[in-house]
């Protein structure tokens, strides 16, 4: 599942040719530098983060402690985590996918064979149609519908409602998933990536602007690490599937949901939750790539994407390194396993958990908010080897949860990585926090833990500027913009040709007239001189 938006930041480069038409109108065409236009960002308030830990969530109507927001999200392996919301008057209960990789709040508004219920806007007395069509394509799937507004309540926040923008989905393709149990998507990103444009206020912005809830939320997703069920793993239309749980804390943190110290990565920009990755290690060995490659063209934290996705070159490097660690113990792993096209199923003679022992830990180093430092997320094999069930052969199998990014989508720290940690989206202070999760560890019960992973290290010094690892999107190449530039250049050339012809004609005519004038004068002088020579000499 991959529901983050596929687009990079929109950066429009207007070459000098594009302004030539204006130059013609003012009779002068001058060579000009290219100009870069970006959408300005909205800056949040600077507040003390410590005040939010364990504090009651203050709203217009009720006080809700973050400790009361435990186990309020559910999910299915590979199908995402969802939270219950009430929409409209009278309230209609729906489950919505929690997605930090997009910014639209959208729910099904018509029947679909993959969902059991949908939003009936005509039955809500508080629904307001905005008269705007919206379409959102994802890397996987898309939906379209009508933009409107209605009252929304989050069940775990108590009797608290606010007005939110809602897209009523009327058409979709590869979006709703069988057995997922959710009927919509809750985009928690920033306004800059909202569709159809940034004027659509996102859900969390509406929540914090209409209440006194602080601009922060946290996710604890207890998926792979808490899973102990040996059968019916993953999704299937053939029968019941395993359900996983978690917590979404809105307005503060619950200190009982994490161990140790929280480490923070600064938000590079406010669109996706973009951070900077400084290195990747397999076991104890660095991939040794230029750090810019890890972040081409961005690195985001996205709960709506299942896998760890990496730029193609990085994916190839990490896959080769993992293969080198596992080949000695597991030489028969099918090649299609590494591309996600096939499952790896242990033989009858091996423990269903044995592969965890032969696969290495992964370490993702992230830029720290401490100047000149980074910190590490140590990822267990139990996170990136997703358990699945082969219903045909009745076997417990594994799926490789690392995949290459498509269409320059960059690196995506998806759900399989987030499931090992308590992840804080501190929008007020423009940072993302990570701490070790208190989710019950299934590996401890089954004896499949590898080292102490997953874990998070203290911040450590680095001898380079981590900001230099970020990808410079101002140089991004956009074929559509390039074609537009060429078209404008052609129009400019067509407009300039008459001007050039006119200028040349004018200069030629001017010179010709000058030459004719000088020719008459010179001829007259010659005639006068000739007459003087022919006159008789009057001197004696």
Swiss-Prot record:
GO biological process terms held by the UniProt record: amyloid-beta metabolic process; membrane protein ectodomain proteolysis
Claim: NADP is one of the keywords in the record: no
Membrane topology: Single-pass type I membrane protein
Entry EC no(s): 3.4.23.-
Xref: CDD domains: beta_secretase_like (cd05473)
Signal peptide stretch: 1-31
Subcellular localization: Membrane
Active site: 99, 302
Keywords, ordered alphabetically: Aspartyl protease, Disulfide bond, Hydrolase, Membrane, Protease, Signal, Transmembrane, Transmembrane helix, Zymogen
Disulphide bridges, residue numbers: 222-439, 291-469, 345-397
GO cellular component annotations of the record: endosome; plasma membrane; trans-Golgi network
TM region(s), chain numbering: 483-503
Gene Ontology MF: a single term: aspartic-type endopeptidase activity
Every Peptidase A1 domain range: 81-435
Intervals, Cytoplasmic compartment: 504-540
UniProt enzyme class: hydrolase
Listed Pfam families: Asp (PF00026)
Entry keyword Signal: yes
Family: Belongs to the peptidase A1 family.
Identification of the protein by name: Beta-secretase
Underlying gene: BACE
């Amino acid at each position: 599942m991959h529901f983050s938006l596929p687009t990079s930041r929109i950066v429009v480069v207007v070459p000098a040719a594009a302004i030539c038409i204006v130059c013609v109108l003012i009779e002068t065409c001058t060579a000009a530098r290219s100009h870069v236009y970006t959408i300005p960002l909205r800056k949040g308030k600077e507040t003390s983060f410590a005040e939010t830990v364990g504090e009651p969530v203050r709203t217009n109507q009720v006080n809700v402690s973050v400790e009361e927001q435990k186990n309020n999200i559910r999910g299915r392996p590979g199908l995402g985590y969802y939270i219950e919301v009430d929409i409209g008057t009278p309230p209609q209960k729906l489950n919505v996918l929690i997605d930090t990789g997009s910014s639209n709040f959208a729910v099904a508004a018509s029947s679909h064979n993959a969902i059991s219920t949908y939003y009936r806007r005509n039955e809500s007395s508080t629904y307001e149609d905005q008269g705007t069509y919206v379409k959102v394509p994802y890397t996987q799937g898309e939906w379209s519908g009508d933009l409107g507004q209605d009252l929304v309540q989050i069940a775990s926040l108590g009797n608290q409602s606010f007005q939110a923008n809602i897209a009523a989905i009327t058409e979709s393709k590869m979006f709703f998933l069988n057995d997922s149990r959710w009927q919509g998507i809750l985009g928690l990103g920033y306004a800059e990536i909202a569709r159809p444009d940034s004027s659509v206020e996102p859900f969390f912005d509406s929540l914090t602007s209409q209440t006194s809830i602080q601009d922060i939320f946290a996710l604890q997703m207890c998926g792979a690490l808490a899973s102990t069920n040996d059968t019916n793993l993953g999704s299937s239309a053939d029968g019941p599937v395993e359900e996983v749980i978690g917590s979404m804390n809105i307005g503060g943190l619950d200190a009982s949901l994490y161990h140790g110290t929280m480490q923070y990565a600064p938000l590079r920009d406010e669109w996706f939750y973009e951070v900077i990755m400084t290195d990747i290690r397999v076991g104890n060995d660095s991939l040794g790539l230029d750090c810019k490659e890890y972040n081409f063209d961005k690195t985001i934290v996205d709960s709506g994407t299942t896998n760890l996705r990496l730029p193609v070159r990085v994916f190839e490097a990490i896959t080769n390194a993992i293969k080198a660690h596992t080949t000695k113990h597991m030489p028969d792993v099918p090649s299609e396993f590494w591309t996600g096209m096939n499952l790896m199923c242990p033989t009858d003679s091996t423990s269903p958990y044995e592969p965890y022992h032969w696969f290495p830990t992964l370490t993702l180093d992230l830029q720290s908010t401490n100047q000149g430092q980074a910190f590490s997320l140590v990822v267990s094999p139990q996170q990136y080897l997703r358990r699945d069930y082969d219903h045909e052969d009745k076997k417990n199998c594994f799926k490789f949860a690392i995949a290459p990014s498509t269409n320059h989508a960059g690196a995506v720290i998806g759900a399989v990585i987030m499931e090992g940690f308590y992840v804080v989206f501190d929008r007020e202070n423009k940072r993302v926090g990570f701490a070790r999760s208190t989710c019950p560890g299934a590996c401890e019960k089954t004896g499949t833990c590898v080292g102490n992973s997953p874990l998070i290290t203290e911040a450590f010094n680095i001898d380079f500027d981590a900001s230099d690892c970020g990808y410079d999107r101002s140089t991004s190449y956009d074929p559509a913009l390039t074609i537009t530039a060429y078209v404008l250049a052609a129009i400019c050339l067509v407009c300039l040709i008459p001007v050039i012809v006119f200028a040349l004609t004018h200069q030629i005519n001017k010179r010709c007239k000058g030459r004719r004038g000088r020719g008459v004068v010179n001829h007259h002088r010659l005639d006068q001189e000739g007459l003087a020579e022919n006159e008789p000499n009057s001197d004696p």
